Structure formats: structure tokens, C-alpha cells
């Protein structure tokens, strides 16, 4: 089957689309990446998404309209990946669309029950591409008592499980998450959870202090030094003390967190603040390894993916934090994969599993009561 995996993440960089060929299903799946592209959001759409994400500035009219606008954007992104690959849209069998997360509440808060909302209307995508769309991947896991995240461990087992090596798959997107993949002979469980911020705080600080969308290759962070009082403040966040399974998002590490941090520590230099929040991402990852993973698993390799793996300052901080742990650290490209395409490929795989009616959540990662089939299916017009 030819499947397009579509992902718009918490970093708001744009729409990632992976055109993938998949044979079979389950752990025997054969997955081939044909082409990958990122279609940037235009400034107007990005601004509307940022407004929709803000509890103070959002409204139901905006979210309703944006749902359909993003559906059209996602459909156009699918057309673009096919065009770049010289691949006929008519050959496409399926689209797996994660959508744009507007709000994610993994645990009950007062009278607010666990819930999640991703937008990007699948009916619009199906109509515009004349292709069946699988979307809304998180909701069934949450209906079964899970946190609806992380979603990608199932696909990571298919792609990265090794005959003899125990691996950690560390994704550093807007939020960071880790998947522990024991080797094929092991009887230990796959576990996965969010480790905290990835690029989200770094990007927010860059935008506010340097008028840049991100710190390219970590060049600015390389110029500063870590400020202990800022790092201590960050590392005291309650999320770091919670036991897995757990998930987080912009609600805890987004604009509000960055705004309060900058106000509290405004006396410090811009470079030092950016260096310190970069170290916060690295330290929060290392903290979770040492507390929740390394006492129970012997890890041979750590494989980094997502946009944060291109931040050499962040990667060096991670290497230093793990230098005594006797595990090799790679990025996706070192082992023949793409850091950028990883999550879009995952949603192509998850769409394929839903098409075959296979459960694809990992209850040991999400906390769900049982394995479930992900997603809603939207058919194109006859």
C-alpha cells in the first residue's frame, strides 16, 4: 500500500508529509520511505493556530473555521509530496493524518475529564485528495483510560527493534518523548513516556529574545553559560517528579511557562537564558533515564530523532549527561533513517495498522486498560 503520513507538531514548523510504501502489517511490516517534505505554514495560518492554542485568546468560531482551513492545508501538503515524488495522487491508497493538537489534557483536573482535540478536518482532506483518511488517533486510547500519548512506540518497534541491542528512541520535537525497545530475545516490556520539553521552550525564548523562530544548530546557546538558579527553577517542575506513564504538552511547557520564566529571570543575559533552557531539555531527558529506565534496563544505544537532534549544542549536553552510562548515542541519520520524517512515517504505519484492524497503542506506554485500534476512518465521495 502507498500511504501518506501527515503530521503537524507542537513546534508549529509546518506540515510534515511522508510518502511511504508498506507491505503487510504488524511486526512483519516492510516499510519504505519514498519521499518526505515539509510544507511551511503561511504566517496567517500560523498566527491563527497560535491564537487557537491560547485559552485567553481563542474562541469557538476561530477553532471551527481553522479546523476546515487546516484540512485544506493538509490536503495540499499531500498533493505537494506526490508532486515532488512524481507520484500520481490516484495511486495513493490511504492518508494517516495526526492533525494539529489544540489542547491535550491527559489527566482529570477538577470537573474536566481527560480529553484531547486535534483539528484538520478529515472530510476536507478526503474530498480534496479523493483518498480514504484515518485521523483522530489519540481518542480511542483515552477512551480506554490511557493518556493518548505517546503514539509512536508501536511504529518504533516495527522500525527499530534489534536482534541483540536494547535501544532508547528519543524524539525531540516540541515535546520530548522516549521509547524503550528491548531486543528481540528480551521478555521485558516496551515502555514509553514524555520526558518534558523538547524544542518548545527553546523556540519560544528564541522568538521573544532574538526574534528568531529557532536556534539554528544551537549556535546562540553555544555562546552562553548555564545559570544555576534558572536551571534549578526549571528542574523543579512537578512534571519531572511524576511516574510514567505520563504525557505533557504546550499546556505545561508552552508560552505561559516561557513568559513567566523570562519575567522572573529578566536580569540575566539573553544568551545565558537560552543556554539554560537548552540545558533544561537535556537534563530533563537525562533525569528520566536515570530515574525510570537505567535502573531496570541495560541500554546499548540511544537514537535521537526530531528537530532537536539537529541542535548540536543540545546533543552535546545530552552526551555529557550520559557519558558515564556506557551507551552509544546516535542520531537517526547515523543508522540510515531521517530525523525529520520519523513522526510522519509513524502515522503512515499507524494508518496501515488501522486499515488492517490491528490494535496499535502500547498500554504499558499510555496507561490504557487494553489494546485498541486507533483512529476514525473517513471515506472520499463515491
From Swiss-Prot:
InterPro entries: Anhydro_N_Ac-Mur_kinase, ATPase_NBD. Keywords: ATP-binding, Carbohydrate metabolism, Kinase, Nucleotide-binding, Transferase. It is an enzyme of class 2 (transferase). The keyword Nucleotide-binding applies. Pfam families: AnmK. Pathway: Amino-sugar metabolism; 1,6-anhydro-N-acetylmuramate degradation; Cell wall biogenesis; peptidoglycan recycling. ATP binds at residues 9-16. The keyword ATP-binding applies. PANTHER family: ANHYDRO-N-ACETYLMURAMIC ACID KINASE. Catalyzes the specific phosphorylation of 1,6-anhydro-N-acetylmuramic acid (anhMurNAc) with the simultaneous cleavage of the 1,6-anhydro ring, generating MurNAc-6-P. Is required for the utilization of anhMurNAc either imported from the medium or derived from its own cell wall murein, and thus plays a role in cell wall recycling. Belongs to the anhydro-N-acetylmuramic acid kinase family. HAMAP family: AnhMurNAc_kinase. This is Anhydro-N-acetylmuramic acid kinase.
